[in-house]
Design a protein with these regions (language model features):
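Post-signal peptide N-terminal segment of secreted/secretory-pathway proteins
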Residues: 12-13
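Two-metal-ion RNase H-like nuclease active-site motif
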Residues: 71-75
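Active-site-adjacent helix-turn-beta-strand microarchitecture at beta-sheet edges
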Residues: 78-81
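Helical "lid/coupling" subdomains associated with nucleotide-phosphate turnover
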Residues: 2-8, 20-25, 30, 36-70, ...
Length: 403
C-alpha cells in the first residue's frame, strides 16, 4: 500500500483497519508496529463509524434519495455483524446492528456442519430468531418496498439472476433463484457464479442471509449498487476536504434518528420542540463566546431531543437512564465520541458537571469543554420551559456586554 502511494506520489491518505482489531488484546502494539514499518497511521473505527462510512457510499447515488421516500432498508452484511437502517419518507427511522455476521455464524456452526444433512436449515434457524425480533419491533408501522444490499457476493448473485446486468430486481425473482442455489454445495455454486475461490465456507452463509432478509422484510425489490466501505472512505475523504459537494443531508439523518428514538421512549414532543428551538437560539446568539461550530450545533439539537428519554424507564433516575439509552443506541452519523458527548450533555443537564479528572476515561479535554458548554445551554433553555407549557413565544436572544 505504501509503495503504491509512493508510486502515485500521493501526499495525503486515510487508512482504516477492520473493527476486528478491537477484539485483539495487543491492538495498540500491532498498530504501532505497522506505523514504524510503513509510516502509515491507521485508524480503527467503531462499529457505528464503520457502518456510516459504508452508508455514505450508497447515499451519494442519485437513486438513493428517491428510493428512500417509499420505505427502504439499507442492509450491510459483514463478517462480524449485520447492520439494518430503515428509511421512511426520506428520513431515518432506526439503525440496528445484529450479531449475524458471516464469520460469527460460521464459528457457531463449525461443530455441526459435517454432521447435518441440510446445513442451510441450521443457518436459517440461527438467523430467523433475530430477524423476527427486529420485525416485531420496527416493522409494525413501516412497509418496506426496497432493500439495498451491501456485502460480498451480492453482485455475483445478481448477475446470475439478472442476465442484463440490472442492479435493481424484483424481490420474488431473487428469492426464487436463491432457493434453487440452496440445493447445491459451495463448489457447485461457485462454479455457477464463476468464482475463483470455490471453497469459501462463507458463500452459503451470505446466500441464506440475503434470502431470509428479503423474505422477512417482505420487500418488493432489491438494489445492489455494487459499492463497499472503500467507496465510502473515498467519498468521506472527498467530502471532508471539500473536493465534492454532498448530495445527501446527513445532518437530517442524525436528527431524524434522534426524533425516532425519542418517540420510542414517549418523549413529550411540544416540550422537546420548544427546548430544541430555544437551545439553538442560545447557541447562535453566543457563537463568539463559545467558539463552537456547525457540528456542535447538531450535537446540541440531538441532546435536546433526547434529554427526557430516560423518564420512560425511571422518573426518579431519568438522567442516568437517558445516558445509558443514548450510549446503547446507534444514531447514524454520530461517532462513538460524539454519542458520548450527547449522553454526557443530557446527564449534566440535571446534575452538576464533574471535574475533568472524573471523566478523563471517557472524554478528552476538547470533548469535556464541549460537554460543559452544551450542558450549560441545555440547562438555560430547559429552565425557560420548566412547566412544559411553552409559555414563551417569539423569543429572541442576544449578548449584551458580558451577559
Amino acid at each position: 500500500y505504501k509503495k503504491i502511494m509512493d508510486g502515485y506520489r500521493a501526499d495525503a491518505y486515510t487508512a482504516y483497519a477492520s473493527g476486528v482489531f478491537r477484539d485483539v488484546k495487543n491492538e495498540l502494539f500491532v498498530l504501532d508496529q505497522l506505523y514504524i514499518r510503513t509510516g502509515i497511521r491507521i485508524q480503527v473505527p467503531s462499529n457505528s463509524e464503520h457502518r456510516f462510512i459504508g452508508y455514505k457510499s450508497v447515499a451519494f447515488r442519485e437513486e438513493f434519495d428517491e428510493m428512500t421516500k417509499q420505505g427502504t432498508a439499507v442492509v450491510d452484511i459483514g463478517g462480524g455483524n449485520l447492520q439494518v437502517t430503515l428509511f421512511a419518507d426520506g428520513r431515518v427511522v432506526t439503525t440496528q446492528h445484529m450479531v449475524l455476521g458471516t464469520m460469527r455464524l460460521r464459528e457457531q456452526l463449525s461443530g455441526i456442519r459435517q454432521a447435518v444433512a441440510h446445513y442451510e436449515n441450521q443457518i436459517e434457524e440461527l438467523v430467523n430468531k433475530d430477524l423476527e425480533v427486529f420485525k416485531s419491533l420496527y416493522l409494525k408501522d413501516n412497509k418496506i418496498k426496497s432493500v439495498i444490499f451491501m456485502g460480498d457476493y451480492i453482485m455475483d448473485l445478481m448477475k446470475k439472476v439478472e442476465k442484463k446486468g440490472n442492479k435493481i430486481m424484483a424481490a420474488e425473482k431473487f428469492v426464487k433463484a436463491m432457493r434453487k442455489l440452496y440445493k447445491k454445495n459451495a463448489e457447485q455454486i461457485a462454479s455457477e457464479l464463476d468464482l475463483s475461490h470455490e471453497n469459501d465456507p462463507l458463500l452459503i452463509l451470505y446466500i441464506v442471509l440475503y434470502t431470509r432478509i428479503t423474505e422477512e422484510l417482505n420487500a418488493e425489490e432489491i438494489w445492489a449498487p455494487g459499492v463497499n466501505v472503500s467507496d465510502g472512505m473515498a467519498y468521506d475523504y472527498a467530502e471532508r476536504h471539500k473536493i465534492i459537494r454532498p448530495t445527501h443531508n446527513f445532518d437530517e439523518d442524525i436528527l431524524s434518528a434522534a426524533k425516532q428514538l425519542s418517540k420510542r421512549y414517549e418523549g413529550f414532543s411540544p416540550h422537546i420542540d420548544a427546548l430544541t428551538s430555544m437551545s439553538v437560539l442560545v447557541f447562535d446568539a453566543m457563537k463568539k463566546v463559545h467558539g463552537m461550530g456547525r457540528r456542535e450545533r447538531i450535537l446540541l439539537q440531538t441532546a435536546a431531543i433526547l434529554h427526557d428519554c430516560g423518564k420512560y424507564v425511571s422518573l426518579a433516575h431519568g438522567p442516568e437512564c437517558a445516558y445509558h439509552i443514548i450510549m446503547e443506541s446507534e444514531i447514524i452519523g454520530l461517532t462513538h465520541l460524539e454519542r458520548q458527548i450527547v449522553a454526557c450533555a443530557v446527564f449534566y443537564n440535571t446534575y452538576p458537571l464533574e471535574d475533568y479528572e472524573e471523566l478523563a476515561d471517557r472524554l478528552d479535554q476538547n470533548s469535556y469543554m464541549t460537554v460543559a458548554k452544551l450542558s450549560a445551554m441545555l440547562r438555560v433553555s430547559n429552565a425557560m420551559d420548566r412547566s412544559h407549557k411553552q409559555k414563551f413565544k417569539n423569543v429572541k436572544a442576544s449578548v449584551r456586554g458580558k451577559q
